[in-house]
């Protein structure tokens, strides 16, 4: 299958041919129909993959980690950490939809042929835990359903704002997630003001402004009527949080969804008794192994809106036409052309969103075949087969074995993950 990845020290994403992943007991294998490019997160991944040693030294935490490693494991370990011999490429993408073509033995709620959304990457096939999938309702656009994971990020941030019918919300940053927050808040009956310096993102909306001062001058907001500020911008500047504290009313809530610094002024929060919340991705369950790997759900009476229930809620809004996303899709392109699109997000005329379209091919053959393999002729080397090619095996064990090529020979590697098996 084909998968979009970013390699270390290569600023242009590439498409790799990798084995189709094998779903685990709590996973489903999905043939992707569409996936949505999340420019902010994915460009950050590309930038991270291309950081030089000098760039990394700018982060004081890396220096501390290096000194600790030097004390514990010596100079060789530090050199290996800075200049690794074998580094897995980064997968891109996390909001897609497609069709279930195989289900793990513990999966009860999904069956072959189901149309589902997932947080799968930009790849022809993805293996995803059942708690990170949701069935697409009938009469729902699959193309719009592909936005569900991004929509759930927006929905979780909105839930954390504790706003209700009639609340006034200011959304700072009108990229994909910011636009989704605005639409969800309006569907909830809130009054929404959007702010983004990119004029193209504020056109055709009377309640969108290129600066907060424009909104104040237009008398859309003042420091007494803003119930919540949701920051969906990505910035290295402290300006978003400073603006939020300036415009929020007393006892208002500020929710940070985007990647921004939080150099906050205590006095700004003290005198207004402001509440600051940093939103974690799609909602409760995120990064919890029990939920995302082992497939254990949270009881609804204790956790009403898990990430999976957020997926379902967003899909229901699409099905009932309470929100529509067709006008948010700037471009739709074939997946095979995906490597060329990222430079568009760096241009002055950057698109709001791009949807990748996958070719609907015949089903792959997923059954294992038993093959007779003749014993290799002896050359005095120890023959090794590796089962499991995770991060530790790929970055530590396999490089060591390569250094021992006079003594041993790796004749095969098996892994449930297509990308790690290819590496």
What residues fall within each predicted segment?
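Short N-terminal strand-loop motif that marks the start
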Residues: 1-88, 120, 353, 357-371
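C-terminal capping/lid region of NAD(P)-dependent oxidoreductase domains
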Residues: 4, 188, 223, 255-258, ...
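A glycine-/small-residue-rich N-terminal strand-loop-strand element
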Residues: 77-90, 95-119
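Conserved acidic E/D residue at the C-terminus of a beta-strand in Rossmann-like folds
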Residues: 196-197, 280, 412-417
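Helix N-cap at the beta1-alpha1 junction of Rossmann-like dinucleotide-binding domains, i.e.
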Residues: 198-201, 261, 417-419
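Glycine-rich cofactor phosphate-binding loops and adjacent beta1-alpha1 units
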Residues: 206-277
């Amino acid at each position: 299958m084909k998968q979009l990845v970013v390699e270390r020290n290569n600023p242009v994403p590439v498409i790799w041919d990798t084995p189709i992943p094998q779903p685990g007991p709590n996973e489903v294998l999905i043939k992707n129909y569409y996936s949505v490019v999340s420019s902010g997160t994915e460009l950050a991944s590309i930038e991270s993959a291309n950081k030089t040693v000098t760039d990394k030294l700018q982060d004081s935490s890396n220096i501390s980690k290096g000194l600790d490693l030097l004390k514990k494991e010596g100079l060789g370990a530090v050199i290996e950490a800075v200049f690794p011999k074998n580094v897995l490429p980064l997968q891109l993408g996390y909001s897609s939809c497609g069709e279930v073509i195989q289900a793990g033995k513990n999966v009860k709620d999904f069956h072959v042929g189901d149309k589902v959304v997932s947080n799968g990457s930009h790849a022809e096939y993805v293996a995803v835990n059942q708690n990170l999938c949701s069935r697409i309702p009938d009469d729902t656009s699959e193309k719009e359903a592909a936005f569900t994971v991004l929509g759930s990020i927006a929905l979780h941030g909105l839930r954390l704002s504790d706003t209700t019918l009639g609340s006034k919300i200011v959304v700072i940053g009108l990229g994909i997630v910011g636009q989704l927050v605005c639409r969800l808040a309006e569907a909830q009956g809130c009054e929404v003001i959007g702010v983004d310096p990119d004029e193209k993102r504020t056109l055709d909306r009377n309640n969108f402004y290129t600066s907060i001062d424009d909104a104040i001058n237009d008398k859309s907001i003042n420091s007494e009527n803003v119930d919540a500020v949701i920051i969906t911008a990505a910035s290295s500047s402290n300006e978003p949080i400073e603006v939020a504290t300036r415009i929020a009313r007393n006892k208002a809530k500020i929710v940070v969804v985007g990647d921004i610094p939080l150099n906050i002024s205590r006095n700004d929060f003290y005198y207004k008794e402001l509440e600051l919340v940093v939103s974690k991705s799609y909602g409760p369950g995120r990064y919890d192994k029990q939920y995302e790997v082992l497939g254990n759900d949270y009881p609804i009476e204790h956790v009403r809106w898990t990430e999976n229930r957020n997926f379902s809620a967003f899909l229901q809004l699409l099905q009932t036409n309470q929100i529509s996303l067709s006008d948010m899709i700037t471009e739709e392109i074939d997946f095979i052309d995906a490597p060329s699109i990222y430079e568009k997000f760096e241009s002055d005329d950057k698109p709001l969103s791009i949807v990748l379209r996958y070719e609907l091919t015949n089903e792959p053959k997923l059954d294992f075949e038993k093959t007779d393999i003749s014993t290799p002729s002896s050359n005095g080397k120890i023959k090794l087969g590796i089962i499991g090619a995770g991060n530790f095996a790929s970055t530590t064990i396999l490089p060591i074995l390569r250094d021992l090529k006079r003594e041993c020979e790796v004749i095969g590697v098996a892994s449930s993950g297509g990308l790690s098996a290819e590496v």
